[in-house]
């Protein structure tokens, strides 16, 4: 099987290329004799980019993920909102690295070249730099960073010159490759923050480490100790013009480094990584490590010099707010063909996938021979349109539109069960593979449930990427007009802000607003990505075709468009084109599809639903079983709403541009605008976001004098009392000075005492627990940690 054949690393797909990379890497290192730091000449500019896997079926995609991706670190960083929290930028995936103590070098090497540092080229370069070159600047920055750390600030630790030298010598020994007695039983000693800083100077390329800020307890998940690894490392020993400005992005969790690489994709997301963390209702800048005091004052300038910093709009925590955050642009794949291992691995994956398909097809045929009544859905061309089942992340195909294969199979299974209720045998009891237009809309699609998706290998890939990692690599913008944010598949095509606004509006709106839902087509009542005057693009094409040509009335309706003779409209408004007559009385245009269907019976009545290939029964008022259920639902809905939707929606002047005072035609590519108005709308959104940011800053400045003025008035000294003192010379207010008067004459000792003072947070930074007076203001866990480690 492919699960055994698929290599567990990229370099195993082509050993010759891997050897060529390992030969070129040490030759590219330049070691000056004048004390300048060792560095790479050209190979530090290469970047790896992973191939897309959404074209494979979920079962085979799972095999690829198991082979290459570190899903534990991926899931941990995403759950902590440190990785892939911003939908405006591309997703990053974590590749596996060896956990032998040299994972920092393995991850860095794999990010650039696709091979791990098994030859210790990067580690030897790090050790030789610390041992042979002038490291006084590195040591000075390390001492400054250590003095600002929590261990020195809170404990009052003080080092003399001998202590500093011993610690620095220990850091140099940790970078050595000759460590038979490494700590924690690893082959090599683990590296620290200063080693990352030296490495980025050797590479002349920034390094961004994404990690949590706290080391958390494995048992309770509570904060245990602060983590300082995450942040930005700039090659400050080099001028910015001599450095490569696209950063290396690494992930860190559980003392392990992994490379975080982008995916080859043509979606609208920006190839960048945010330079902020989203935490507790605010955006916090990533820490820039090993800055001197003068450099810390010009941090923003340094970031723009060493990185390609751009501003991107993101949704704020409050509804309707937009913030501009800084992000660093990432490099695209630029490895030469002779050393590009991703292409070879992708070719190998495609080869194994063909073999896997053949084996799966053979097994499916054997299973189908044993159970011939089990239906199967053929795989045809995929469409770049989402399945219309709410919350379904898959894409529709030509033969199953407007549904994906998973939802289509589930609906067919439901159809196979329903005809059993009807005792009369007929064609409606047989499962149909290719359904007609009206037949395809017998049901509104149910909400998608991943647990109900069909199991077992399919003969061909499904219509969508997996919800695990790659479900939004082809993500589109929110379907709300004028919204600049990226959609979320869990919110049925809307972004989080628009989804919350719709939920709030739906809770206050009456039930009759269902026909006015902007996300539904008023003609076919299907959930669509965008509507044109209330109808979807498929219905619009059909109505315009009918208006332009009289011959189009004889054509069968589109597979997405509801027929004009919807059963819910037969009683209210029978039109001359309605196809509610039975048998031979039906018009030829309505029976064109039924006439081509095999199994046509003479002497029995066709279903009253236009385009339905099955036969009706007198018990169901001339409908087949499925159409009769739809007829009852629509009739009940029409009676409840009190009004009938129009039989057809038409445009009078095609699609006008949404821009003000613009007479040109709009385009779906530009969200209903023409190209000129679309560019103006984008600029307006950008300036509005910038203006909102400035207003927030100005309001914060105005609030400062008010708070200082209010805090200048003295308050009562009792912790549970918030009254203002009438006289500055007293400490207690009048109520606290005369408690008996406040309690009243009927008070006695049995009444409850005043409320206790509010609990204070633990003194340890970033700790979520409450402090304890017996533990000197710390929580029990932090107090025990402080007692153990001083």
Curated annotation (Swiss-Prot):
Cellular localization per UniProt: Cytoplasm; Nucleus; Lysosome
Region: Required for lysosomal localization and for TRAF2 lysosomal degradation, residue numbers: 697-790
Effect after changing residue 100 to A: Strongly reduced deubiquitinase activity
Result of altering residue 624 to A: Marked attenuation of ubiquitin ligase activity and inhibition of RIPK1 degradation
Catalytic reactions of this protein: Thiol-dependent hydrolysis of ester, thioester, amide, peptide and isopeptide bonds formed by the C-terminal Gly of ubiquitin (a 76-residue protein attached to proteins as an intracellular targeting signal)
Spans annotated as Interaction with RIPK1: 386-453
UniProt record similarity statement: Belongs to the peptidase C64 family.
Written domain comment of the UniProt record: The A20-type zinc fingers mediate the ubiquitin ligase activity. The A20-type zinc finger 4 selectively recognizes 'Lys-63'-linked polyubiquitin. The A20-type zinc finger 4-7 are sufficient to bind polyubiquitin.
PANTHER family in alphabetical order: TUMOR NECROSIS FACTOR ALPHA-INDUCED PROTEIN 3 (PTHR13367:SF3), UBIQUITIN THIOESTERASE (PTHR13367)
Subunit and partners: Homodimer. Interacts with TNIP1, TAX1BP1 and TRAF2. Interacts with RNF11, ITCH and TAX1BP1 only after TNF stimulation; these interaction are transient and they are lost after 1 hour of stimulation with TNF. Interacts with YWHAZ and YWHAH. Interacts with IKBKG; the interaction is induced by TNF stimulation and by polyubiquitin. Interacts with RIPK1. Interacts with UBE2N; the interaction requires TAX1BP1. Interacts with TRAF6; the interaction is inhibited by HTLV-1 protein Tax.
The name this protein goes by in its record: Tumor necrosis factor alpha-induced protein 3
Source species: Homo sapiens (Human)
